[in-house]
Design a protein with these regions (language model features):
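Aromatic "clamp/platform" in nucleotide-sugar-dependent glycosyltransferases that forms part
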Residues: 13
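Short hydrophobic beta-strand element within catalytic cores of glycosyltransferases
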Residues: 26, 30-34
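Active-site helix-initiating loop/hinge in glycosyltransferases
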Residues: 6, 16-18
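A charged, aromatic-enriched C-terminal amphipathic alpha-helix characteristic of glycosyltransferases
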Residues: 67-105
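Short alpha-helical donor nucleotide-sugar binding micro-motif in glycosyltransferases
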Residues: 1-5
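Short alpha-helical segment that forms part of, or immediately flanks, the ligand-binding pocket
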Residues: 18-26, 40
Length: 105
């Protein structure tokens, strides 16, 4: 779905770590996000922060942008889906081992 988009627009007032923004960046989309979001997603030049309380800058900024290839910047910032998946599998395997050890006691 993201590959069919020209840009990712995320005017949110409150978010933790907006993973959807990281996913959009990984797909090469320029991201227009509200200035209220965490700076943890400022991992490449494809992020444009806009004021959440003023629609005019949003309208002015979003105009059929060019897709960007930001994959290296994203991975360098520690957002690698393969690495994250491996860490999650490791965590589940460790939890399973601990649960099995407790059953054997």
């Amino acid at each position: 779905l993201l590959q069919a988009m020209d840009a990712f627009v995320f005017p949110s007032k409150w978010e933790g770590l907006p993973v959807s923004v990281v996913e959009a960046l990984s797909s090469g989309l320029p991201c227009y996000i509200s200035d209220t979001l965490t700076h943890d997603v400022d991992i490449c030049d494809a992020v444009t922060r806009l004021p959440i309380d003023d629609p005019r800058p949003w309208v002015d900024s979003i105009s059929l942008p060019c897709r960007v290839d930001a994959r290296r910047d994203i991975e360098a910032a520690g957002f690698d889906i393969h690495d994250s998946a491996r860490k999650l599998v490791d965590l589940y395997e460790k939890a399973e081992r601990l649960a099995n050890e407790r059953k054997c006691r």
